[in-house]
């Protein structure tokens, strides 16, 4: 589990790009949690209307630099910024339905108000037939 704190590096409506992850090269990372700091706005228009979003280029970058990555979690309502819907659609497709490579699962709207470290993370989704998404509960804990 790797946690990247971008809370001092992102602004409203900004695209989160591969350059922001140039210092992460842990080939063992299977879960990447991206903390933007926008969780403090949960329940407000600011949280839903002005958050940053993930660039579609991140999916390719993560596949190249984090070969064991299976899942990305964010403290944003969606990886798609409300103000940049087309790029958001591309990002969802790039992560979940890549033309080549494996899917990288997404967990959106996470509560990431701690910095870890975590030894184990359990993701328990509500399984719904023929759905392209579902609510899930995430448990994170440390052995120490």
Protein language model features and the residues they cover:
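Active-/binding-site microenvironments in catalytic and ligand-binding cores
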Residues: 1-144
